[in-house]
A protein has these predicted regions:
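Compositionally biased terminal segments of proteins
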Residues: 1-123
């Protein structure tokens, strides 16, 4: 099943802000799920975020996501495993690692793309 939102960029920013304002396990899980399952993969997601990546609110939201997923032991990956109610230690470690790697790969791809000039000429 695919649930469409208007755009991934405002969704990620909103969820990033929610990470700081409330502590619900579903917020990091939503971020992980959407990043991992985005149609077209990380490159398509990063291309959609790219035109907005220099805006203050977007940087703030992505920064809060980066903080929450700064390591496999940070609140982001741990909340993903908690939300899925994973109790097996090996499976839990794998899920935390997977969440950490997906989110950090997305953030790095956005950084790489936003460092290059926009081919459309937009700022």
């Amino acid at each position: 099943m695919v649930v469409r939102v208007a755009s991934i960029m405002p969704f990620l920013v909103m969820k990033g802000m929610a990470l700081a304002d409330r502590l619900k396990e579903k917020d990091p899980w939503d971020i992980y799920y959407c990043v991992r399952n985005y149609p077209g993969g990380l490159d398509a997601l990063a291309e959609e975020v790219r035109p907005h990546a220099r805006r203050g609110l977007v940087r703030e939201g992505l920064g809060k996501i980066a903080n929450a997923f700064a390591s496999v032991d940070h609140i982001g990956p741990v909340s993903v495993a908690d939300f899925e109610e994973v109790s097996d230690l090996e499976e839990r470690a794998f899920l935390c690692r997977d969440a950490y790697e997906w989110i950090n790969a997305m953030l790095e791809r956005v950084r790489q793309l936003s460092a290059r000039p926009d081919p459309t000429g937009k700022k």
